[in-house]
Regions:
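Single-pass alpha-helical transmembrane segments
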Residues: 384-408
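Solvent-exposed, extramembrane regions of membrane proteins
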Residues: 1-18, 36, 245, 255-385, ...
């Protein structure tokens, strides 16, 4: 399912495609405030750059307006998610490790206590290093993986500390007790880039790889391809959430921000009414159970979540922009919002795979059932239209048609009665097609006419119109009608 959400985010967010499938939700996309030049959200100068980092702020999303839960203002809920990401340094947080009795070396990364019971070396991640001495001077591109590898580790906050199910306990520079921490480890392996990559997460400037382009002549020197600067680059993200009761005063309507596991509990006291509290808990349980924040996208899809792979073929990649990492994170963020939209709607629709029924959590009180029955879902088999707009268009069009037929005779009548601009009126009438024909026939001098100043002139009863004079075939003209057939 997540891959379908990813496709929807690519096709529909920012209204790029206008596809019919983009009408799946009450809102085609959820707008987000994005700061692409944010300061480092972490401490101890651990970010690769002090500025040029990224922050996503959804603002206060409304359960009615943004997620389609049809409810009066006093039953609505607001939800906000803020995500901050930055590439972080590996210098000082990385060590090389060689397996005993082996030539295989690994890079180990130390961003906290990983709770690894089987090792005294509490690293958070390790990845094999590329030994260029065994890679045939860098020309054997098949000797290592020629695709991306991405791995994720998470540290969830709960009640002012890190939850027992967190993957690791972060170092002080990465700790923030009101937001979850997610680390994304990226390796480009033996991917060769056609140009140097200055992006801080995809950074590639090592020119040890040569490639003999089959398009070039046999005597041509090999092309230089650039590979990753280090075995792994690390991207760190904070994600925090917040709920608000829009019916409370502004200074007390929102809960403190917190991680995804605790944000709903922090907001539980905002609703004193038991009915509204049950409605909030159901809504928040959907958000929390889905748990689709931006980090989940690479966590579940792996390297398929990277848009940089679109330009990858047989281990070779074209150039990447300097902000490729920001494009990747923005793509994950949008996919996570689509997933949130879809899961809220799917909760009301129910499951399509009955094999999942044993794990289905059904609404068990009146308020929860009411929320499910109040979900607005678009149906592609039907179309909505405005009756007022349609009626207004028909009425206006009919009025224009009537005026187009009635305006000329009405004005002509007024002009005749008041003797306004008689010459202009008669010239207008005389230039009509039927009046021009009347003038031509009348010049013969044999036909008597009525309505010579009207739109449609007619002959008197029994009058015959002129006929063509064909004595000069190159210059036909009108003549009086013959008295007998022989006179034609």
């Amino acid at each position: 399912m997540l891959s379908s959400y990813e496709n929807y985010a690519e096709d529909c967010y920012d209204n790029v495609s206008g596809l019919g499938s983009c009408n799946a939700f009450i809102k085609a996309d959820i707008p987000t405030k994005i700061d692409t030049n944010a300061s480092c959200p972490f401490g101890d100068d651990i970010c690769k750059h002090e500025y040029g980092n990224i922050v996503f702020d959804t603002g206060y999303l409304d359960s009615h307006l943004d997620f389609g839960i049809n409810a009066p203002p006093n039953e609505r809920i607001q939800f906000r998610r803020v995500s901050s990401c930055a590439p972080i340094k590996t210098d000082g947080y990385r060590k090389s490790y060689r397996l005993p009795d082996s030539n295989n070396s690994y890079s180990r990364y130390y961003y906290g206590d990983s709770h690894v019971d089987y090792s005294d070396d509490l690293y958070t991640y390790e990845y094999p290093e590329i030994n260029w001495d065994t890679q045939t001077s860098g020309q054997d591109v098949n000797a290592a993986r020629t695709d991306y590898t991405i791995y994720q580790s998470n540290a969830f906050v709960l009640n002012g500390s890190y939850a027992s199910y967190a993957d690791f306990l972060p170092i002080p520079a990465l700790r923030k007790m009101d937001a979850d921490l997610h680390l994304m480890y990226l390796s480009s392996n033996m991917i060769g880039y056609s140009e140097e990559v200055d992006d801080p997460w995809f950074s590639a400037h090592v020119d040890k790889m040569k490639w003999y382009n089959p398009v070039n002549s046999p005597d041509a020197p090999p092309d230089t391809l650039y590979t990753q600067d280090e075995p792994v680059s690390v991207l760190a993200c904070y994600v925090s959430e917040q709920y608000c009761n829009p019916n409370l005063p502004e200074e007390t309507r929102c809960s403190p921000v917190g991680g995804i596991s605790e944000s709903a509990f922090l907001a539980d006291g905002l609703w004193q009414n038991a009915k509204h509290q049950r409605m909030f808990r159901w809504f928040a349980s959907i958000i929390m159970a889905s748990g689709v924040t931006l980090d989940v996208v690479p966590g579940l899809l792996g390297d398929a979540a990277l848009t940089a792979r679109h330009g990858l073929q047989l281990g070779h990649s074209g150039p990447l922009p300097d902000n490729q990492w920001q494009l990747e994170v923005e793509h994950w963020h949008r996919t996570s919002l689509v997933a949130t939209q879809a899961i809220i709607a799917d909760t009301a629709k129910g499951i399509s795979d009955m094999h999942l029924e044993p794990w289905l959590v059904r609404p068990n009180n009146t308020e929860e059932k009411h929320l499910c029955n109040s979900q607005k879902i678009r149906n592609a088999e039907y179309f909505n239209f405005s009756v007022f707009g349609l009626a207004f268009t028909l009425a206006l069009g009919s009025l224009i048609i009537v005026l187009s037929y009635a305006l000329e005779p009405i004005l002509g009548c007024v002009q005749r009665r008041r003797s306004w601009d008689t010459y202009a009126r008669l010239e207008w009438v005389s230039n009509e097609t039927l009046q021009l024909q009347r003038l031509a026939h009348e010049e013969v001098g044999l036909v008597k006419w009525e309505g010579c100043a009207e739109n449609v002139p007619v002959t008197e009863k029994g009058e015959k119109l002129a006929v063509l004079d064909l004595h000069d075939l190159e210059h036909p003209r009108l003549k009086a009608p013959p008295r007998t057939f022989a006179g034609v």
